[in-house]
């Protein structure tokens, strides 16, 4: 997953998606894998996989009936949010954790890191297009850092496209 974060390759992507299913298949209903410290490695890998598949974004408040997924293209990120029940909350984007938490000048590869996928530049302008028309427009990174308010009815889907700024 760390390698894929830096070098997107379709064969590597397919292998990761295949192998995570093997890992998930090992998990018992209790959540335990093998009952030793290696379970922590599994949990870390599962978190890394989840961060990749959401491009680092998350929803607040969390609800088990609300799902988020994301994909990236060369200059865009697509976020899809679905809710089984009515839900109101915010889509929160990841931050440049290497800078804001670890005080590192660059996001260099490190053992046990959680890769950064889509992070905001607070001084940039982002373009958003969505099937929820009220979300369409230009946003400053510092405003997006606070989240995007979303309201979903039961079984509704929200699609949001965020275009990277031109630098």
Task: Describe every region a protein language model picked out.
Residues 1-166:
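Glycan-recognition and catalytic cores of secretory/periplasmic carbohydrate-active enzymes
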């Amino acid at each position: 997953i760390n390698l894929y974060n830096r070098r997107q390759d379709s064969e590597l992507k397919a292998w990761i998606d295949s192998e995570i299913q093997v890992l998930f298949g090992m998990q018992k209903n209790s959540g335990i894998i093998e009952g030793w410290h290696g379970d922590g490695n599994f949990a870390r890998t599962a978190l890394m996989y989840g961060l990749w598949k959401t491009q680092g974004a998350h929803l607040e408040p969390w609800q088990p009936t609300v799902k988020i997924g994301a994909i990236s293209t060369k200059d865009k990120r697509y976020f899809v949010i679905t809710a089984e029940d009515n839900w109101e909350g915010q889509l929160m984007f990841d931050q440049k954790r290497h800078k804001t938490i670890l005080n590192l000048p660059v996001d260099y590869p490190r053992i046990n890191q959680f890769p950064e996928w889509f992070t905001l530049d607070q001084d940039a302008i982002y373009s958003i297009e969505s099937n929820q028309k009220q979300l369409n427009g230009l946003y400053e990174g510092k405003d997006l850092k606070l989240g995007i308010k979303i309201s979903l009815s039961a079984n509704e889907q929200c699609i949001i496209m965020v275009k990277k700024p031109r630098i």
